[in-house]
């Protein structure tokens, strides 16, 4: 699992798959921010927008934990589900604990709200689990948007707006 996690974190993205509607959304946003993970930086670059903000580790994915043993051999999907579930219950071997990811999500929500006040529209190119943690924070603070952004597909945005 250790090697799989390492390869996954170093993997590139297929930028040709990006939908044109997302490119238009990125070009209309006042600010486009992203995680510091390479696949996220590449995804943002593929949007063809003016991306002045530096990639920020604050938005980086809550990495998948893994044990120090390599048996039994099971499909990676099984281990991803097993270890992500275990992570939510406190297993954080080789990664930050869920409490730290939640702290980062609060700080990320602060930053996105600040950017939204300054630029009106902000696009975050992020990652599933961290996006879900950030969404939870935004909704707690009165923002309106999907409760489960984990269910949206790759390249599909989730929109959050201030409640009037």
Segments (PLM) and residue ranges:
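Signature for phosphate-centric chemistry
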Residues: 58-74
């Amino acid at each position: 699992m250790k090697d799989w996690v390492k390869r996954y974190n170093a993997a590139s993205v297929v930028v040709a798959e990006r939908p044109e509607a997302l490119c238009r959304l990125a070009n209309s946003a006042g600010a486009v921010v992203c995680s510091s993970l390479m696949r996220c930086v590449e995804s943002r670059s593929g949007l063809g927008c003016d991306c002045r903000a530096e990639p920020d580790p604050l938005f980086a994915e809550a990495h998948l934990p893994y044990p120090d043993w390599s048996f039994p051999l099971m499909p990676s999907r099984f281990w991803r589900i097993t270890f992500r579930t275990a992570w939510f219950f406190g297993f954080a071997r080789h990664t930050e604990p869920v409490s730290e990811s939640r702290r980062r999500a609060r700080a990320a929500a602060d930053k996105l709200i600040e950017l939204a006040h300054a630029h009106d529209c902000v696009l975050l190119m992020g990652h599933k689990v961290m996006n879900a943690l950030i969404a939870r924070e935004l909704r707690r603070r009165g923002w309106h948007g999907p409760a489960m952004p984990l269910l949206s597909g790759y390249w599909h945005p989730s929109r959050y707006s201030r409640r009037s």
